[in-house]
Amino acid sequence: MKTFSAKGHEVQRDWFVIDATDKVLGRVASEVALRLRGKHKPEFTPHVDTGDFIVVINAGKLRVTGTKATEKTYYRHSGYPGGIYETNFLKMQQRFPGRALEKAVKGMLPKGPLGYAMIKKLKVYAEATHPHAAQQPKALEL
């Protein structure tokens, strides 16, 4: 018997919506990364993007445990000498709600072209409204 290998054009992709209100950042990110990758499906193939589309709403209401709200730091660099910028979780959530979740999920996905294709299927919104109602996303409880 031959081992099944999924083909990219034959994969059935579903849409899911996750409400992140008062959920812990890492727990939401790990479940989102698992579903973006397609590891929850029996036809999972490591070198093929078999994942689903994920819409995360209320990302501005995510929380972290302990003292990570003030101590977890995010870095970015302008490309110029001495051009490193540093911020914490609270400031990041106030300025760009949802970016902390995007960075957490991106770190859990594979690096390279396959990971870049997977992260494009993640849609994060700070509020409860989203423009993907036409896709009829199913609610996903965590």
Swiss-Prot record:
The keyword Ribonucleoprotein applies. One of its GO terms (cellular component) is cytosolic large ribosomal subunit. Pfam families: Ribosomal_L13 (PF00572). GO terms for biological process: negative regulation of translation; translation. Keywords: Ribonucleoprotein, Ribosomal protein. GO terms for molecular function: mRNA binding; structural constituent of ribosome. Part of the 50S ribosomal subunit. Belongs to the universal ribosomal protein uL13 family. NCBIfam families: rplM_bact. This protein is one of the early assembly proteins of the 50S ribosomal subunit, although it is not seen to bind rRNA by itself. It is important during the early stages of 50S assembly. This is Large ribosomal subunit protein uL13. It comes from Janthinobacterium sp. (strain Marseille). The lineage of its organism: Bacteria, Pseudomonadati, Pseudomonadota, Betaproteobacteria, Burkholderiales.
